[in-house]
Design a protein with these regions (language model features):
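Low-complexity, Gly/Ser/Thr/Pro-rich intrinsically disordered linker/tail segments
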Residues: 109-118
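Alpha-helical segment that forms one wall of the substrate-binding/catalytic cleft
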Residues: 6-60, 64-73
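Charged, glycine/proline-rich intrinsically disordered loops and linkers
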Residues: 1-2
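Catalytic and substrate-binding regions of cell-wall glycan-acting enzymes that process beta-1,4-linked
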Residues: 56-108
Length: 118
């Protein structure tokens, strides 16, 4: 089955159109990294509102992204052991990135001027 997903976000056309309409961002482009990141924030927030998934739960957010909000509600992912395995890998990666960020957060929060003296 051919998908309409492309660009950084790999968003399908109907979902991308919903994003553009709901955010009044009619010029958003799936091949623009900034727009794709804004889309992800929108999608994560909607997933939280629609299915009650924490914005910090990478595993369940991923399953919603892959299966769609209705597919997740129906439990479609429960019939796909491979997908659950991938979602666990996504979650482990998110936890690793969060740990890495904490180790350099202080350095990143310094202004450019103070970085000159580090």
């Amino acid at each position: 089955r051919v998908s309409s997903a492309y660009g950084y976000s790999q968003a399908k056309t109907p979902t991308w159109d919903d994003y553009k309409r709901e955010t009044n961002n009619s010029w958003a482009d799936r091949t623009d990294f900034h727009d794709a990141m804004d889309f992800m924030g929108w999608f994560i927030n909607k997933t939280n509102k629609i299915n009650g998934i924490s914005k910090w739960d990478a595993e369940l957010q991923y399953l919603n992204y892959h299966e769609g909000w209705s597919g997740y509600k129906r439990g479609n992912h429960n019939k796909k052991a491979w997908l659950i395995d991938v979602a666990k890998i996504v979650n482990a990666r998110a936890l690793r990135y969060a740990t890495q960020l904490k180790t350099c957060e202080e350095e990143l929060s310094k202004g450019w001027f103070w970085k000159l003296f580090s």
